[in-house]
């Protein structure tokens, strides 16, 4: 199954097993996802479900968005996401339908995608976990410097992809094979074992695990 849900990271807590073992979990709020468009091979060249989640103030919805949501007959959400469909999947899902956290009732492992916390401009020590140079023994000013970044006249340049200082974080990060600890249908909550990338209240994409 390739259909997933759009959720929101609430935060982390822990749950206990009957034996008293503490399990760290991330709480994901999965409010019902509304289907805004069903893409087909005939009209779009591929099969996918387009969904929205949450809500957005009417004053914040521009005219193209308003028209798109009105055509689907659903309330405007905070964004639009797509789930590519496999062959013969999702044939019974129509525009306006709702997908709930109940989708994960029979699933043990999930992949969760979020945007990692932005750290701004960082040096090579923090960004790439480089070792620091000597604190003393004649070293000055170069304690947190990355060191050599290349060779001499040959090749006479710095190779692409060289690990150097730069912007860190604020990247799309997928954490794979997270165990589903609990599915709370009444409160639209999904509890997964371990950490998920991103800050609290950040949007996350939850899919059945690919490598499970």
From Swiss-Prot:
A Pfam family it matches: Ribosomal_L3
GO CC, one annotated term: cytosolic large ribosomal subunit
Post-translational modifications reported in the UniProt record: Methylated by PrmB.
GO molecular function, one term: structural constituent of ribosome
Residue positions where N5-methylglutamine is found in the record: 153
UniProt-listed InterPro entries: Ribosomal_uL3 (IPR000597), Ribosomal_uL3_bac/org-type (IPR019927), Ribosomal_uL3_CS (IPR019926), Transl_B-barrel_sf (IPR009000)
An annotated GO BP: translation
Entry keyword set: Methylation, Ribonucleoprotein, Ribosomal protein, RNA-binding, rRNA-binding
HAMAP family in UniProt: Ribosomal_uL3_B
Membership in a protein family: Belongs to the universal ribosomal protein uL3 family.
Subunit structure and binding partners: Part of the 50S ribosomal subunit. Forms a cluster with proteins L14 and L19.
Cross-referenced PANTHER family: 50S RIBOSOMAL PROTEIN L3 (PTHR11229), LARGE RIBOSOMAL SUBUNIT PROTEIN UL3C (PTHR11229:SF16)
Biological role stated in the UniProt entry: One of the primary rRNA binding proteins, it binds directly near the 3'-end of the 23S rRNA, where it nucleates assembly of the 50S subunit.
Name of the protein: Large ribosomal subunit protein uL3
Native species: Psychromonas ingrahamii (strain DSM 17664 / CCUG 51855 / 37)
The encoding gene: rplC
């Amino acid at each position: 199954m390739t259909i997933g849900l759009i959720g929101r990271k609430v935060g982390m807590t822990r749950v206990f097993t009957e034996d008293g073992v503490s399990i760290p979990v991330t709480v994901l709020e999965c409010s019902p996802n509304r289907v805004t468009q069903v893409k087909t091979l005939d009209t779009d060249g591929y099969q996918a479900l387009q969904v929205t989640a949450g809500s957005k103030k009417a004053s914040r919805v521009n005219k193209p968005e308003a028209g798109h949501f009105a055509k689907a007959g659903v309330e405007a959400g905070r964004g639009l996401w797509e789930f590519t469909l496999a062959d013969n999947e999702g044939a019974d899902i129509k525009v306006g339908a709702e997908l709930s956290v109940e989708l994960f009732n029979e699933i043990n492992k999930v992949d969760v995608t979020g945007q990692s916390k932005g750290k701004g401009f960082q040096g090579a020590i923090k960004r790439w976990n480089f070792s620091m140079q000597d604190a003393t023994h004649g070293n000055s000013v170069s304690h947190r410097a990355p060191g050599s970044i290349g060779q001499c006249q040959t090749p006479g340049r710095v190779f692409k992809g060289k690990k150097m200082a730069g912007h860190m974080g604020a990247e799309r990060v997928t954490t794979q094979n997270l165990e589903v600890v609990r599915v709370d249908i009444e409160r639209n909550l999904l509890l997964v074992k371990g950490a998920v990338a991103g800050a609290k209240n950040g949007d996350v994409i939850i899919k059945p695990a690919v490598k499970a």
